[in-house]
């Protein structure tokens, strides 16, 4: 059965059962904390959290998902994929356990001719949570599943939560037995290679409290509305129904492998593991890259763009290592389109753009590889010739800085050459470069440090600023500069990611140049007449010698020639947001002085669309009441709809009027004054502002903090950003109130009660944990091993034991071992990934040269930690839990040598 048919049957099955088919969300959501959508239920989270009311009681979808943390494992095993499809059915307060089990079982076991998948019921198993007898009953009732094919499992396997307070509940997983050729019998508990999970049914029935792990949280009580969230792995089902061992053999990925195998001199599945890995990398990454590009991402150096760039570059390099020297990306993207577009038609509709972006990255990276590979080979040879096994940080930095090699590529190439890389040295050099770049950027922003190139234009006279009266102005290009050098013409290069600093100097401009805390306007410059095809985005505007406007641009089409007439146009939405932020800053300043008094003097500010930051001289933090008063006074002034107007006057007259000036700032003899509401606010200011205070919109103070001795900072949102912030907080409060089952006004008291209960529970847990450890200590003393004439207790204790508890326990155990030479070494997995360990040595063992402070060093080396102490008692802590057994073995070996 083809994968598209598997997907279609899933949706058809649930639509017939009264579910609404919900299309897959984009893999890119408007959430900065989520790089890519990585689970089928992500788009439904607001409904499960009670933040939004679902428009349906039942829904079904097949979601595109991307997971890239294990990108380096792709291809090495057949289990890891960066893209997968998760089919899911969801119930929002409608059916529950019985319905979920019945729907899943019916689809899996119904004959193919009846619309099902036709799985043999005798080869299906289920797992349930330890005490979920209800689910067991339904598996027997609905599916006729015998008890011997239903296994109970703990919280780590069969209890679901989102990792934060909110809905949680037991889950039930469905497994398929692939047969004895894949491993021993005994169900999922015995062998998950033979028994492969294909569907997970989550029964959201409880609320969970705080906790830091999958198991460390309190179950608070039942949910008012029980929900269902399920996930069926489409690719896993495809493997089983197509009779293949892994997803790379399915109809989704095998075509890409076959494409490359028809070109490469070495084939797939010929017994060369490294080649097979490269084939699988190409197949997996090409599909994921096409999906990401299709959802609007372009290759870049940060975030999602960087992930995409890395995927594409790994494809290209894997192909090179297989002996494919010619471009291959265009054909790969076409192969992905053919395989995936039956399910995702947007891949066909937007194919030209997807292919163009992928091919452009291939072309650019081929140049990078050609120039950088020789340097890497030379550096690797020199490293080995010197007897070293680690490529220097300087070499890795040069590859990155000069040839564009990402560090991950250098790491891969080094590993293939049996070398490691000095990553710490590389990152130190990168940090130095960033610092230099920051300093250079600051110099360029402050004054275009080298004015010689601009001197002629500076001497010719200032740019006429028209932005107080209009947002679009016709202007003449006085000069064009690329990286500080004057040129007669600049054109669109067609090269993505060009880094040249291109600036236009115009005789007049509506763009506000960054100054006075207000960031520069953004917008466009377009050609006129014969140059009407010329268009550029204005991304920044800086002043040169305080008189000349330098417009930083990205040329998008055509060419600009010195002397041309152009139209400079400010983005009106950007300007409106900037004026809201700047006027809001004046309002907050006035409110601060009204609440705190005249000593609250401005020390600096920053305002941009929707946001303001205001620094002022003040000793000590503001009280909550002062913050509330400042916010209230500001919003009262907004509501008053004060008129905002500006005028120019002599500096002395402005000061006599009471206009506020920034201390230490040099002002000309004639200054611009901005007045809001008569006496409410009067400041010297050259920035852009709203026409009335009501246009600022609501002002929400986000916080107040210290930024230096005697200087405090207030940050706030204004306008729509303020509304969005308040709406988000309201939704969070509603979610909390819903989760806690109390009205919003009672949330603080309820939280305080829960915190107190949690503390009491933690104390009781600590008591029980220590009691259990003491019991284990008694048994440990009785079972001490004899190494030479030294009795040794070297034991791993239960997780969660603190260093203080271990010290108490080693003393108790040592006391039970008598006066013969004895050593006690205890180690445990503590909180926050720590690994505490303690060693105690009695006097008789010390007489034989055994010292506790020496033994903790041995243990520390095994767990990436260190310790110290005295001859009789020493302790330490590490971070490598994987080394605990090695630490205990090292102690035994050390005692054996004593």
Swiss-Prot record:
InterPro entries: aa-tRNA-synth_II/BPL/LPL, Ala-tRNA-lgiase_IIc, Ala-tRNA-ligase_IIc_anticod-bd, Ala-tRNA-synth_IIc_core, Ala-tRNA-synth_IIc_N, Ala-tRNA_ligase, Ala_tRNA_ligase_euk/bac, DHHA1_dom. Zn(2+) binds at residues 582, 586, 685, 689. It is an enzyme of class 6 (ligase). Keywords: Aminoacyl-tRNA synthetase, ATP-binding, Cytoplasm, Ligase, Metal-binding, Nucleotide-binding, Protein biosynthesis, RNA-binding, tRNA-binding, Zinc. Its EC number is 6.1.1.7. Belongs to the class-II aminoacyl-tRNA synthetase family. Catalyzes the attachment of alanine to tRNA(Ala) in a two-step reaction: alanine is first activated by ATP to form Ala-AMP and then transferred to the acceptor end of tRNA(Ala). Also edits incorrectly charged Ser-tRNA(Ala) and Gly-tRNA(Ala) via its editing domain. This is Alanine--tRNA ligase.
């Amino acid at each position: 059965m083809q994968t598209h048919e598997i997907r279609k049957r899933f949706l058809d099955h649930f639509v017939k059962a009264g579910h609404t088919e919900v299309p897959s969300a984009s893999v890119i959501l408007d959430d900065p904390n989520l790089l890519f959508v990585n689970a089928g239920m992500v788009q439904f989270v607001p409904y499960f959290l009670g933040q939004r009311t679902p428009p349906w009681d039942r829904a079904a979808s097949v979601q595109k998902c991307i997971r890239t943390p294990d990108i380096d494992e792709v291809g090495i095993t057949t289990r890891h994929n960066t893209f997968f499809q998760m089919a899911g059915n969801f119930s929002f307060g409608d059916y529950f356990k019985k319905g979920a089990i019945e729907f899943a079982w019916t689809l899996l076991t119904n004959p193919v001719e009846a619309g099902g998948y036709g799985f043999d019921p005798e080869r299906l198993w289920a797992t349930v949570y330890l005490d979920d007898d209800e689910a067991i009953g339904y598996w027997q009732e609905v599916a006729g599943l015998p008890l011997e094919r239903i296994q109970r499992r703990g919280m780590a396997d069969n209890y679901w939560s989102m990792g934060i307070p909110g809905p949680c509940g037991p889950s039930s997983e469905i497994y398929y037995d692939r047969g004895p050729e894949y491993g021993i019998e005994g169900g999922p508990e015995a062998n998950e290679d033979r028994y492969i999970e294909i569907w997970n049914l989550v029964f959201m029935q409880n609320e969970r409290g705080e906790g830091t792990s999958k198991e460390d949280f309190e179950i608070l009580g039942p949910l008012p509305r029980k929900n269902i969230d399920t996930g069926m792995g489409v690719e896993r089902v495809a493997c089983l129904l197509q009779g293949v061992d892994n997803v790379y053999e399915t109809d989704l990925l095998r075509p890409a492998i076959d494409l490359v195998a028809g070109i490469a001199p070495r084939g797939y599945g010929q017994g060369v593991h490294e080649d097979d890995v490269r084939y699988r990398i190409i197949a997996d990454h090409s599909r994921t890259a096409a999906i990401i590009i299709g959802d609007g991402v372009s290759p870049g150096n940060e975030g999602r763009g960087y992930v995409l760039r890395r995927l594409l570059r790994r494809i290209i390099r894997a192909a090179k290592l297989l002996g494919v020297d010619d471009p291959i990306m265009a054909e790969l993207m076409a192969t992905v389109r053919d395989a995936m577009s039956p399910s995702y038609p947007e891949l066909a509709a937007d194919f030209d753009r997807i292919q163009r972006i992928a091919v452009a990255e291939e072309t650019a990276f081929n140049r990078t590889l050609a120039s950088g590979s020789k340097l890497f080979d030379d550096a690797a040879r020199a490293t080995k010739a010197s007897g070293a096994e680690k490529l220097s940080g300087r070499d890795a930095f040069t590859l990155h800085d000069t040839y564009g090699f990402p560090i991950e590529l250098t790491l891969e190439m080094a590993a293939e050459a049996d070398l490691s890389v000095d990553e710490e040295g590389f990152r130190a050099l990168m940090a130095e470069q960033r610092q230099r770049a920051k300093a250079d950027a600051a110099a360029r922003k402050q004054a275009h440090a080298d004015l010689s190139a601009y001197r002629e234009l500076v001497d010719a006279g200032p740019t006429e600023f028209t932005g107080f009266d209009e947002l679009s102005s016709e202007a003449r290009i006085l000069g064009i500069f690329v990286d500080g050098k004057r040129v007669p013409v600049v054109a669109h290069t067609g090269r993505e990611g060009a880094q040249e600093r291109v600036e236009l100097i115009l005789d007049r401009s509506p763009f506000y140049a960054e100054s006075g805390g207000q960031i520069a306007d953004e917008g466009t410059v377009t050609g006129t007449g014969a140059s009407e095809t010329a268009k550029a985005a204005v991304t920044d505007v800086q002043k040169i010698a305080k008189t000349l406007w330098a417009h930083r641009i990205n040329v998008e089409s055509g060419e600009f020639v010195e002397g041309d007439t152009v139209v400079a146009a400010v983005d009106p939405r950007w300007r409106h947001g900037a004026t809201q932020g700047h006027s809001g800053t004046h309002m907050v300043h006035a409110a601060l002085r009204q609440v705190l008094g005249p000593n609250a003097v401005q020390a600096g500010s920053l305002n941009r669309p929707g946001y303001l930051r205001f620094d002022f001289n003040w000793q000590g933090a503001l009280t909550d009441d002062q913050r509330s008063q400042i916010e209230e006074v500001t919003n009262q002034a907004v509501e008053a709809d004060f008129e905002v107007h500006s005028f120019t006057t002599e500096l002395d007259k402005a000061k006599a009027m009471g206009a506020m000036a920034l201390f230490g700032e040099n002002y000309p003899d004639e200054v611009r004054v901005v007045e809001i509401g008569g006496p409410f606010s009067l400041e010297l200011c050259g920035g852009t502002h709203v026409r009335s205070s009501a246009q600022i919109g609501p002002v929400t103070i986000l916080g107040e903090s210290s930024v230096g001795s005697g200087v405090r900072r207030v940050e706030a949102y204004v306008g729509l950003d303020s509304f969005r912030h308040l709406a988000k907080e309201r939704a969070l409060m509603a979610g909390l109130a819903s989760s806690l089952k109390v009205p919003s006004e009672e949330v603080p008291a309820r939280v305080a009660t829960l915190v107190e209960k949690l503390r009491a529970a933690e104390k009781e847990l600590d008591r029980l944990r220590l009691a259990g450890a003491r019991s284990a200590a008694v048994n440990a003393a009785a079972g001490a091993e004899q190494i030479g004439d030294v009795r040794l207790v070297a034991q791993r204790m239960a997780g969660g034991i603190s260093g203080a508890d271990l010290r108490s326990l080693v003393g108790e155990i040592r006391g039970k071992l008598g006066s013969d030479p004895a050593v006690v070494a205890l180690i445990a997995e503590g909180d926050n990934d720590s690994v505490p360990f303690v060693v105690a040595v009695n006097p008789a063992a010390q007489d034989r040269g055994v010292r506790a402070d020496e033994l903790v060093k041995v243990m520390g080396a095994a767990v990436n930690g260190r310790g110290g102490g005295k001859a009789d008692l020493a302790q330490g802590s590490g971070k490598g839990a994987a080394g605990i057994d090695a630490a205990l073995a090292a102690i035994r070996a050390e005692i054996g040598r004593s």
